Structure formats: structure tokens, C-alpha cells
Amino acid sequence: MKGGGFYQNQYLVPNVYFGNSSPVIAPIGGNALNNNNNNNNNNNNNGNNNNGININISNFQHQQHQIHQQHFGGLSPNMNQNHIIQHISHHQHQQAQQIQIIQNNNQPQPQQHQIQHQQQQQQQIQQQIQQQQIQQQQIQQQQIQQQQQQQIQQQQQQSKMNFIRGHHQRNSSFDEFSLSDVSVGSFKDMGWEEIYFCYHHFTQMDEGKGYLKSFQQLIRYITGLYPDISPSPNSQFLFSLGLLYPNALPQVQSPNMILSLTLKQMIETYSYTKSMVYSGSGSGGGNSGSGGGNSGSGGSSGNGTSGSGGSNNGSTIIINNTNLNNINNNNNTNNNNTNNINIPSTPPILRSLANGASSTNINIRKFSPQQACHIIDVFNSVKDNKTGGVSTLKLSLFGADASLLPLTTLPFHEFVQYIGLNIIPFENLFKPPPPPSSQLQSSPPIESQHLFLSEIDELTNNNQNNQNNNQQQQQYQQQQHHQQQQQQYQQQPQPQPQPQHQPFIYFEDTSNNNSPLDGNFNNSFGLFNNNNVVNHSPLGNNILNNIQQFNNQNNNQNNNNNNNNNNNNNNNNNNNNNNNNNNNNNNNNNHNNNNHNNNNNNNNQNNIFNHNQNQNNHLINNHSPNQYNNQGNILKNSGSVVEPPSQQQQYFSDIEISFSELKISSKLGEGTFGVVYKGLWRGSSVAIKQIKINEDVNNQVLEEFRKELTILSRLRHPNIVLLMAACTAPPNLCFITEYLPGGSLYDALHSKKIKMNMQLYKKLAIQIAQGMNYLHLSGVIHRDIKSLNLLLDEHMNVKICDFGLSKLKSKSTEMTKSIGSPIWMSPELLMGEDYTEKVDVYAFGIILWELGTGELPYSGLDSVQLALAVTTKSLRPPIPNAWPYQLSHLIQACWHQDPLKRPSFTEILNLLNEIP
């Protein structure tokens, strides 16, 4: 057994590898010696032999010593015990140090701890980033949903916009009916003055380009249309423009933005703005700022853009009724007083009607904005580019009565005025094929008025001018007479019956809410007889025949001119040479009662001027056989007085149609007065009410019925159902109204059970009161107001139907002595006593109660019990205590037992506005 085995196992240096399998000897003393010896072994011995021998001997001895150490486990056998103990303790100390080093290596270092902390922070940051990404995705999804909702809302708004644009088509049918929709504004009909001012101001602003290119031009255009309103309704006009034409104005608006606004857009926007500017009356009647208050050419009120002569220009443009403009001033010679009128929300013309002005008999036609554009288009297609007007001879193409027109060139304001007076039938207007260079907006000056104004002092040849005009007119009348005789001769031996004048009663009406003024001024056709005119719509299919007929007429006129050896041409030349003097004379003598030069004796009793044995170059236009004072319609360079129409034509020629024109599609309902059908008339959806009558209906009753229909057909109000036509030939006795798809208020309250709130309650109540107020001011008593006779349109607007027709109702097969429904009937009606318009006020009180409760009053009582309780015991429905005091007080006042103590609808409107 080899020595040193224990020590070899106990004193090995751990974790040390030297490349061989022999154990490592623990270091002992003499290491320095051994190292020196090793170093010495590597040295080259260059000394003497003796030194080399000694070195070799010492090395040999050292090798022997190492051999002995290896045999005894690294301990020299010559070492004593102390050396061994020291060696062991030293080795243990080294081993303890190595263990400490190993433990220190196993503990985490501070740098590693920081790295781990940073890694944890990075993980947290990554988690936060992931959460943020998730939130962003959720936000993006929400944004996508919001965008989709906005697109849906925009589509809904676009559909509403499309409805507003087509709002003028009153009889259009709609597939959907919503009780929550609310309409915004509507188109309003325009008078000839408004059409002229829209056209005139546009031509002053467009710089000959046919469109407004800047925002400054647009603002000046709006200001010119409303000279008497301060400040101008710019916001309402721009709002209407945005509704009708969303892309007309840039989204980012600035004073320097570039526009391209056409005359058609301006006219339609002006018509739509009327419903907002004059919202107080709910009618949007005439606009004094656009013709009503400016009777000069381009505004003699001082605010017009082209008028500079004040009241001296009155002969160029004469407003239909000067007194309507000067409400508080009887002096017709000073139109500048219109600026002193404070313009409230109600138009001045409507205020004059409410004040009892005698203008209810004036028959002035009004036009939709589309019709106005058609008039302008026709004018631009037939006018002379040199003079800017239309020759009177050209007007024969449109069936105009040449005897009522001056033998001069008509500027635009006279052209449109003659159309407004129906001297030039609007239905016969058509646009001839234009030359390639003509456009609707490319319009030279519409009147050469400056020629007359520049030579106002040249009045030397007035007598000669009048003689020339008289000769020219006589020759023209002879030509017309000769032409009529020739046509009558050609029609023999079987003379054709005279064509009945059946004008377009309802052409492209643009408003679901018409003006109350339309009842007095609108759609009054057939004022003048024209035996040789066949009326056609400008959009019809008979234009070629119409052109051919008038071409034949022109050929006859040319032949007559040749037979007269050019005398007519000579007279025309004289007239043209002296035209300025004639107009100057008219301008100076416009308001001078003693200096008028007349062509014909004035036989009109209603002339506002006192003409006696003088000759007149003005046309005194009185449309109705009824006498009225202070009414005049004077045109420039005219030479005759318009004869009033016959009584028969005045009463029903405009409203009566043939039953064969109607196409009945379905039955809507049936009542005691008649059966209501849905049908078609001239391409529009209408409601046809066929009347139940007895056999004892004689001609006198039918005549009264026709007269009553004529009055009712002229009623125009946004809350009145439009009466469009009627058939007055038994047994097919019926009348035609506009069709409202919303049904009756009765069905909405008691069948559909709509949810009523105060906002909707006030809206319905105010609209009913507005319609009834208009009827009463027009002299019409309804006598049968009830929820069944209140119809609704698509946007929950109320329209009153089944009014008037008292003569025919009394002959109904199932009507009793008392006309109406017992629930809504007043005590005086139930008792068969005399009654006034206050019977409608009583019924309105019952309707207010019905609106608030959604129920019918007097449940459990039959008609006899109800009549006795209402007349003898003053029975009324109970009013809930939770209702506002103002509303309760109003209802009690409306159904008061004494008719004299019931308020008028004018007072009712004021009280309704006070309800919170």
C-alpha cells in the first residue's frame, strides 16, 4: 500500500484540472527553491565544468526529493509534526476561501438585479401597449359605427332634402307616413313684381356671365331683393340655398369663395325664403321688398338698384294696386312713403287685406318658381337682342289679345306683368327653338328705359305722335277684324263652336303651404275672351299644332299688311320715331288728373283717375265686374280699356271640368255628404268627393253651388285643403281636392293612438286656428269643424277640408236640418237658431279637449241626450286639473254658451302663443 492515500484524498485542490490523471501535490515550503531549480534547469550553463557539475547534482537531489514526496502523498517524510499542522491549517483556510467564492458566485449580482427589473418594466410597458392597441381598436370600431350612423343620418337628411325640393308637387304620393317628421319651410308663389326684381337684380349683378361668381355679389343680390327690411334676411336666404342646393356653397365659407349661382337657383331660393321671412302669417304672401313696395322701374321707393327717378318713373312699372303698398298713405303719387312702413313678419299686402282694404276682388295671377323660370326662358328666347324686349307681333304666338297690348316692344317687366294679368295666357307660352348662342342667363338689358329718361324734356310733337298712334291702332284693329272674318268664312258651312276657355288651374304648384293671398289673386283665369286661341301647357304635346295655328295667323296678317300698301309700316316708323316723346309725356303726366291724353273714352266706373273726354295712353285694368275704389293697374303705351268678363265665365269657367277627365282608383271613405275616392286628374293624385243629392236639385241650386265653388277655389292657405276642380253636371256632381296620405286627425288620435306632447299639441292647435282664421277673414263659415275634417300630410301638418258648400249640403240625402256632428256642434246649431262664425269657435274648443285627452267627449250619451244636455244644462267635457291654466281658460272661453263671449280666431292665436 502506497503512503499518503488519506492526504491525497483530503487535500486535492477542487475544480482544478491540469491535463493529467495524477493527483496534484499540495504546495509546501521550498516552492521558491523548486521554482529556482526549475528555472535553473532551463538555463544554458556557460560557466566552468565545476559549476555545471554542482548544478546538475543539486538538480538531481531535488528530483529525488520530489520522488519521495510523491510516494508520501505530497508530504515530505522529513517534515515534522508542526510543519504538517501548519500545512493542514493553511490548506483549510484556502478551502474556506474557495467555498466563500463559490457562495458569492451563486448570489445574484446588482447588475443582474437591474436587468431583471428592466425586463419586468419592459413587460409591463408591452402589456400597456397591448391594452392601448385594444382600446384604439375599440375606438376605431366606435368611430366606424358613428360614421355609419352619420351616413344613415345624412341619407335621411338627403331624403328629406329631396322631399323639400319636390315639395312644390302638391299631389305627389308618398309611400311612407311618419308622425314625427317635421317640414322646414316651403315654396311660395311669386307675383309678377317679384319675378321682375329677381330677374332685374340678377342681370345687374352677373356682369353678363349668367351666374353670380362671388359671395359679395350674392349678398348684394339679397340686399337688393329686400330693400325695406333691415337688416336683410341674409341668413334665411343662405339657409334656404343650402337646403335646396347643398353643393352650391363651399363647406368652408369665406368672403373670397368662388360661386356659380344661376338665376334659376336664385328664384327658387327666393321663393323658399318667403316662408321663413314672412313666417308670422304662415303664408309668405307678397313681398313688398321685391315688387310690392317698389312701383318704379327698378324701385321708385328709393332703394331700387336701377330706379333713379323716384315717383316720376311710375309710368314704366305700375304696381297692381298702389294702395296696397301705401297702406297708411292715400297719396298714390308718392311711392317713397313705402320706406316708412315697418316691415313685421306679416307681408304688407296681407296686412292691408286684414285692415279691410277693397283689394279682395283683384285677380292677379301668381306663379311657382318653376313657372317663373319658364317665363324668363320664353322671354329670352323671343326677345330682340338690340332692344332687349319682345315685339307685340310676336306675342300672337302665345295667343295674346293684340287689341289689349300696346303696339311697341315690351320690356321684361311689361311682358311678365301682362302674363300676371292673364292678357298673355301663361298656358300658351312655349320656347321656340333657340339659336346656338342663346342661353337662359345670357341676357342683355331687359329694358331700354334710359332712352326715355335721357330725353324727358323733348315734348314738342305730342299731338302728331298721338295721331300716328291712333292711325296705327285703327289699322291694326281693321287687320284683326278682317282676319276674324276670313277665319269665320273658312269655317262655313259648318261653323265650329267657340272653344271654351279652360286654362291650367293647377300647373306645377310648388307649395304645400300656399299664401292666403292666393285666394284673392291666384289662378284667376279666363278674364278676357279670345276666340282664336287654343290653350296648351308649355310642357304639353300639342305645341306644334299651336305653332302652326299662329303661323297661319301671321300669314294672314302679312297679307293684310301688303293690301294696305305699307301704310302700316309707315305708321310703325312714325311710332318708333316718336316713341320717346310719348313716354316722356306719360312720365310727366302719370299722376296729373287733368293732363292725360287718351285714345279711347274711359267707361270704367272704377278708374282711380278722373278722366273726362281726354285720351289715355294707359291701360286701366279692372278684372272683376264688382265695383271697387282705388284699384288700378296701369301699363305703359296702351290704348284701350279691358272689358270685364261675362258673368258665366267669371263664376265657374276656371274650376269646372268634365267628369271624363277623372280616373277613380280606390274608395277612401263615405259620409253623410258623399263618397270620397282616390283618383288621378291630369297626372296627379287627387281626392274625388262625389256628392249625394236629391232629385229636387234645380238649376238655381246648381248655379249657387257653382258660385260657391268659385269662391272656395280661390282660397289658398297652408292649412286649407286645396280645391282644385269640380264637376257641376248631375248626376256626377263632385269636386276634386289635393290628396293627403296622412289620413284624418280622428284616425291619428283614436286609431293610431299617437303620443301627444305639448309641442305637438300647440303645433296642431295653432295650425287649425290659422286655417280657420283665414276662412273667417275670407267670409267663409265652416259649420262642420271636427277631427274627421282635419287631414294630415306626411309631416303631421293639419289641413282643413269639407268647408263651405252650404247650398248643396242642405240638399244632401241624409243631412238633417242641423248641419254638422252633434259632438262638435254649438248650442245654437243644435237648436236650429241663427248662427255666426262663432259656431266654428265652439267646435274648436271641443277639438282642443279631444287633442289633449285622445278621447271623444260625451261617452254614453246618444244624440238626443247630448243635444238636450248641451243646450239646456250647458254640459261640457271635464277639463283635467293638470292642464295649464291658460289652456283651460281658452277652452272654456271657446265653448261658452253665449256666442258673443267666444273669442275670435285672431284672439285665439294670441292666447295659444301664451301657453307654456
Curated annotation (Swiss-Prot):
Residues 662-916 form the Protein kinase domain. It catalyses: L-seryl-[protein] + ATP = O-phospho-L-seryl-[protein] + ADP + H(+); L-threonyl-[protein] + ATP = O-phospho-L-threonyl-[protein] + ADP + H(+). Its EC number is 2.7.11.1. PANTHER family: MIXED LINEAGE KINASE DOMAIN-LIKE PROTEIN, SERINE/THREONINE-PROTEIN KINASE TNNI3K-RELATED. It comes from the Eukaryota. Keywords: ATP-binding, Kinase, Nucleotide-binding, Serine/threonine-protein kinase, Transferase. This is Probable serine/threonine-protein kinase DDB_G0267514. InterPro entries: Kinase-like_dom_sf (IPR011009), Prot_kinase_dom (IPR000719), Protein_kinase_ATP_BS (IPR017441), Ser-Thr/Tyr_kinase_cat_dom (IPR001245), Ser/Thr_kinase_AS (IPR008271), Ser/Thr_Kinases-Pseudokinases (IPR051681). Pfam families: PK_Tyr_Ser-Thr. It comes from Dictyostelium discoideum. Residues 623-646 have a biased composition (Polar residues). ATP binds at residues 668-676, 689. It is an enzyme of class 2 (transferase). Residues 461-493, 550-622 have a biased composition (Low complexity). The active site is at residue 784. GO terms for biological process: signal transduction. Belongs to the protein kinase superfamily. TKL Ser/Thr protein kinase family. One of its GO terms (cellular component) is cytoplasm. Residues 283-311, 461-518, 550-646 are annotated as: Disordered. GO terms for molecular function: ATP binding; protein kinase activity; protein serine kinase activity; protein serine/threonine kinase activity.
